[in-house]
């Protein structure tokens, strides 16, 4: 340890001497301050700041440790000031002196943390300073006046009593100093003290806090945090953490007078089990057996040195082997035991804190933690305090979970998951263990809620992220960590699986958000997003989202059935003599679930598990409630393992080694796992040549090479040429097959071959066969092979074309020679033959509509204008075309578009062709029925001729049909002779036309969007299908309704 500078030592000693001292002449030997006591205290504070804090040294603190400043002077000053304050006699100068004492105590009592950035001189003097802090703590708690802590609390009462508007930075600083002093007193570890620690342990300080009003101050500050008092949230959280760490909620709330005796008995039993069996003075007679092994000698002496028991005695005398593990970051919490009075104080304080201060404090702290980029000590403090007070609320006689609602929500859950994720990344396993304990306690609290609807909502939010569930399942595979971490993992896993199982049974539509590898569909080269096949637009997107987000409990549970997870449970069970009974039950339930319910038997057929079960059944205490369940499980385990080994002898070898995932199905069922045929993934778009597919192969290669070079894919073409050259050098015959190396490895473009359809088409033209590689997750997923049927001459010819058009510029634009079309459209054209045939087929589908006449089979006037076919209505598109950017419209834009369409839409009748109402059964012919029909038609014609003999019936029908479908031209003269019914019908059509025009004008005025460049007179009613003629004017109200949209003329310009 470095020697302290003499100048510093002399200065500090002189300052402390001038501060004051005891007046031995008086009867009570009271402490008397010097004339410059306040200046002396300020000098000590300046020395601490200027020398220790700024220079990173500890010389001043070591000098103070050798004086009586903290042990005698400061406690005497605070005690005197407190007495004067209670009597109302304290002066402002004494108030400043007491505050200066507190400013010195806080840095001297600050916990010493050793890390990589701590200066060497501080590390060397850390033990000395910690011993000095223990002396300080003993002096402050054991002062005869028992009022030092009360004096510190009295210092901040004026600041707390002020309103938020009247409180300044000095008041906030005083409150922080007091809270830091409370934190420092709690943080000093009494385990490092030499000798007795009864006066400075947790029980002593809790009793002092209760008697001197510190707990009341903490309740007041916590209840006002956030809205009235700011700046003390994190220090107060740290104080609560130091108060409750290491304590067990169950022990605090379930205390019996005989419990200390039980604790001592348990400690003695543990010591006896771990103590090796050695020889005694009374066992030196009788026979002796000595075993020599690898140069070492082991002897057994005594009456028990018989052959059948010697080896067993050898094993008992051995110490259990210690497995060397990697050092873990952080310090594991040590259990702390407190007395009955301290348990009562902490229990009452915790209940009062939940009633008034928990929600305000935790909500303010959570908001502060959300601003932090990295997890620090404050995260651990938050998680420990959260777990403690949730446990307090669970163990109350009448729990009210509304008092802890600030930590049972999605925001607090995110803090827990963030601590686990970043803790795993930083290998801070202490943080991970604390977060697991907090998460488990949160699940238990949610399960205990009486309001099922609220609990179900909370669970749905907790389990929404599938990434978090996967991360929690992976924690059980960390079997190399200490037993404390593994116990927490087993505890959390048991609660999580039971909660998820019960929740999924009650809610079959539980969805979780899965992180997709691609956030959205990739756009094609034309800028349009690939259309979905089976369902239109948004409907198919919703189906995909639901299918991907639906939670499958069996799939989630199977993540736990891993080799490392079973190793973790074996590591926990191997310490069965030290475990509580609850851990034995949780482990057995998990193994039974895997072995019996999920039929994961082969994973448990391991030699270490076989030996473990045998030892547990033999050595578990008969009074243990889990002994019989383990015996039953072990019997079932052996009954299934022996027949399976006889059926599959390879299991006898597999019990020694870790199981290979690929062989699990065979070992379990005796059959090879069926290989799922992987569907070949083909693109929905293909490229075709505008000049036709009958052009020469050289012309196709020329167009493809020019197109690739135009797209700046020169390296891809060069790679292909080099590979073909190496192929020509390697191929010695015409029957060899080549699997060229993947382009992704050479060009560092992982999916060039997978996603470039033009390059794939070029490779296929050369003769390569492209197929998908199953279960390929890294790099290229395409297997490129060249069949042996492709001769060397073909390869040389293709290579020559590639080199020629790679170096020779072309006299055309490549994008005009090749285009991208949908694969199904191209296949449909290929299946339908030439264009003329397809046109004939379309014309056959659109046969004209015939009217009954005298001669039903007369089709001489088929080309007459009267018999023109009714134009076929264009199907309404259900898939929106997207913009060239390839990005889908947002929900807000789609809703805005639907509103605009609904406002600018009117309903008009629509005509149908008779083909729309003809079914397959109408093709059946019946001669007798036709004969009766024609006879009845002839009778009707005769009756009409008799009623009006001067009117030609066929001419009348002809005129009516033309008028109905608006085929009467403007110049055509219509006969004046018409019946009264025809006249009424024509007048009704004119009225309908006028009503439709007035309706369009009203809609145009009502939905005028205020475009400056558009005039409302330019609006006209147009059909969605611009190619369709005007709809029938004479349709009746019983016809189906079709919508028309009011469209601005300016839309056509866009």
UniProtKB/Swiss-Prot annotation:
A GO BP entry: DNA repair
Domain of life, per UniProt, equals Eukaryota
Give the CC-aspect GO terms.
replication fork protection complex
Q: Where is this region: Disordered?
A: 522-543, 823-846, 865-953, 968-1054
Disulfide bridge positions per record: none
- Which Pfam families would you find in this protein's record? TIMELESS (PF04821)
What InterPro entries does the annotation carry?
Answer: Timeless (IPR044998), Timeless_N (IPR006906)
Mention one GO molecular function.
DNA binding
Q: Where in the cell is it found?
A: Nucleus
Keyword DNA repair on entry: yes
Family assignment? Belongs to the timeless family.
As for what it does, the entry says:
Forms a fork protection complex (FPC) with CSM3 and which is required for chromosome segregation during meiosis and DNA damage repair. FPC coordinates leading and lagging strand synthesis and moves with the replication fork. FPC stabilizes replication forks in a configuration that is recognized by replication checkpoint sensors.
Q: What name is this protein filed under? A: Topoisomerase 1-associated factor 1
Gene name of this polypeptide:
TOF1
């Amino acid at each position: 340890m470095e020697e302290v500078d003499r100048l510093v030592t002399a200065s500090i000693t002189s300052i402390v001497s001038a501060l004051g001292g005891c007046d031995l002449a008086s009867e009570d030997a009271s402490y008397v301050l010097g004339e410059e006591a306040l200046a002396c205290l300020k000098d000590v504070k300046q020395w601490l700041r200027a020398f220790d804090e700024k220079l990173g040294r500890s010389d001043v603190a070591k000098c103070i440790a050798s004086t009586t400043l903290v042990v005698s002077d400061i406690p005497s000053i605070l005690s005197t000031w407190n007495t004067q304050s209670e009597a109302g006699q304290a002066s402002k100068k004494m108030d400043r002196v007491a505050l200066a004492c507190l400013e010195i105590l806080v840095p001297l009592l600050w916990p010493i943390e050793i890390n990589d950035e701590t200066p060497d001189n501080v590390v060397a003097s850390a033990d000395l300073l910690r011993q000095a802090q223990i002396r300080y703590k003993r002096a402050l708690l054991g002062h005869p006046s028992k009022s030092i802590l009360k004096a510190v609390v009295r210092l901040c009462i004026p600041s707390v009593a002020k309103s938020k508007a009247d409180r300044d930075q000095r008041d906030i600083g005083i409150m922080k100093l007091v809270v830091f002093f409370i934190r420092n007193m709690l943080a000093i570890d009494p385990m490092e003290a030499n000798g007795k620690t009864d006066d400075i342990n947790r029980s002593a300080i809790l009793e002092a806090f209760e008697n001197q009003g510190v707990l009341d101050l903490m309740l007041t500050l916590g209840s006002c945090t956030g809205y009235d008092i700011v700046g003390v949230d994190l220090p107060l959280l740290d104080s609560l953490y130091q108060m409750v760490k290491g304590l067990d909620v169950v022990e605090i709330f379930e205390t019996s007078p005989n419990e200390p005796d039980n604790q001592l008995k348990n400690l003695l039993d543990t010591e006896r089990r771990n103590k090796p069996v050695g020889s005694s003075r009374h066992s030196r007679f009788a026979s002796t057996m000595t075993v020599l092994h690898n140069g070492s000698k082991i002897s057994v002496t005594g009456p028990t040195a018989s052959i059948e028991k010697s080896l067993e005695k050898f094993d008992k005398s051995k110490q259990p082997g210690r497995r060397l593990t990697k050092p873990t970051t952080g310090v594991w919490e040590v259990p702390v035991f407190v007395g009955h009075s301290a348990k009562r104080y902490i229990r009452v304080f915790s209940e009062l804190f939940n009633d008034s201060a928990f929600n305000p404090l935790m909500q303010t702290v959570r908001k502060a933690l959300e601003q932090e980029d990295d997890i620090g000590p404050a995260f651990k403090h938050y998680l420990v305090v959260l777990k403690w007070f949730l446990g307090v609320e669970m163990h109350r006689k009448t729990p009210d979970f509304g008092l802890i609602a600030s930590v049972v929500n999605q925001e607090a859950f995110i803090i827990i998951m963030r601590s686990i994720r970043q803790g795993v990344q930083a290998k801070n396993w202490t943080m991970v263990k604390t977060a697991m304990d907090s998460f488990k306690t949160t699940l238990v609290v949610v399960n205990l809620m009486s309001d099922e609807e609220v609990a179900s909502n909370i669970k749905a939010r907790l389990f929404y992220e599938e990434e978090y569930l996967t991360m929690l399942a992976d924690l059980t595979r960390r079997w190399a960590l200490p037993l404390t971490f593994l116990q927490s993992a087993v505890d959390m896993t048991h609660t999580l699986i039971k909660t998820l199982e019960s929740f999924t049974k009650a809610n079959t539509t539980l969805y979780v958000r899965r992180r997709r590898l691609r956030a959205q569909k990739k756009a094609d080269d034309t800028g349009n997003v690939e259309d979905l096949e089976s369902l239109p637009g948004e409907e198919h997107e919703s189906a995909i989202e639901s299918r991907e987000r639906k939670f499958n409990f069996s799939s989630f549970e199977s993540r736990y059935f891993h080799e490392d997870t079973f190793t973790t449970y074996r590591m926990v069970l191997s310490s069965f003599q030290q475990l509580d009974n609850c851990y034995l039950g949780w482990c057995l339930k998990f193994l039974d679930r895997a072995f019996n319910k999920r039929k994961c038997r082969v994973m448990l057929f391991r030699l270490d598990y076989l030996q473990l079960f045998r030892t547990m059944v033999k050595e578990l205490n008969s009074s243990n409630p889990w002994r019989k369940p383990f015996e039953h499980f072990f019997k079932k385990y052996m009954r299934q393992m022996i027949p399976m080994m006889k059926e599959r002898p390879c299991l006898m070898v597999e019990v020694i080694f870790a199981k290979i995932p690929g062989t699990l199905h065979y070992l379990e069922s005796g059959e090879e796992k069926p290989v799922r045929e992987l569907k070949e993934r083909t693109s929905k778009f293909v490229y075709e040549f505008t000049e036709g597919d009958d052009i020469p192969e050289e012309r196709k290669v020329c167009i493809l090479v020019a197109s690739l070079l135009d797209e700046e894919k020169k390296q891809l073409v060069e790679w292909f040429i080099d590979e073909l050259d190496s192929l020509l050098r390697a191929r010695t015959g015409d029957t060899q097959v080549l699997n060229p190396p993947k382009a992704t490895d050479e060009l560092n473009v992982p999916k060039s071959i997978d996603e470039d359809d033009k390059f794939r088409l070029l490779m296929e033209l050369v003769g390569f066969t492209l197929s998908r590689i199953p279960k390929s997750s890294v790099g290229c997923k395409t297997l490129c092979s060249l069949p042996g049927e492709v001769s060397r001459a073909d390869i040389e010819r293709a290579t020559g074309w590639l080199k020629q058009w790679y170096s020779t510029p072309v006299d055309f634009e490549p994008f005009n020679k090749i285009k991208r079309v949908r694969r199904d459209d191209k296949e449909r054209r290929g299946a339908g033959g030439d264009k003329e045939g397809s046109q004939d087929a379309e014309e056959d589908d659109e046969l004209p509509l015939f009217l009954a006449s005298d001669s039903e089979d007369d089709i001489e006037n088929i080309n007459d204008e009267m018999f023109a076919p009714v134009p076929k209505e264009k199907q309404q598109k259900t898939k929106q075309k997207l913009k060239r950017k390839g990005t889908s419209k947002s929900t807000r834009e789609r809703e805005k578009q639907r509103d605009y369409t609904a406002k600018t839409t009117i309903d008009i009748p629509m005509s149908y062709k008779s083909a729309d109402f003809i079914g397959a059964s109408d093709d059946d012919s019946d001669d007798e029925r036709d004969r009766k029909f024609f006879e009845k038609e002839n009778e009707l014609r005769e009756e009409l001729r008799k009623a009006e003999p001067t009117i030609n019936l066929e001419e009348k029908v002809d005129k009516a049909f033309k008028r109905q479908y608006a085929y009467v031209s403007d110049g055509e003269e219509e006969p004046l002779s018409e019946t009264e019914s025809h006249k009424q019908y024509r007048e009704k059509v004119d009225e309908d036309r006028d009503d439709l025009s007035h309706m369009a004008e009203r809609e145009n005025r009502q939905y005028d969007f205020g475009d400056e460049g558009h005039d409302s007179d330019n609006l006209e009613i147009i059909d969605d299908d611009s190619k369709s003629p005007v709809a029938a004017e004479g349709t009746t109200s019983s016809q189906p309704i079709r919508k028309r949209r009011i469209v601005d003329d300016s839309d056509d310009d866009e």
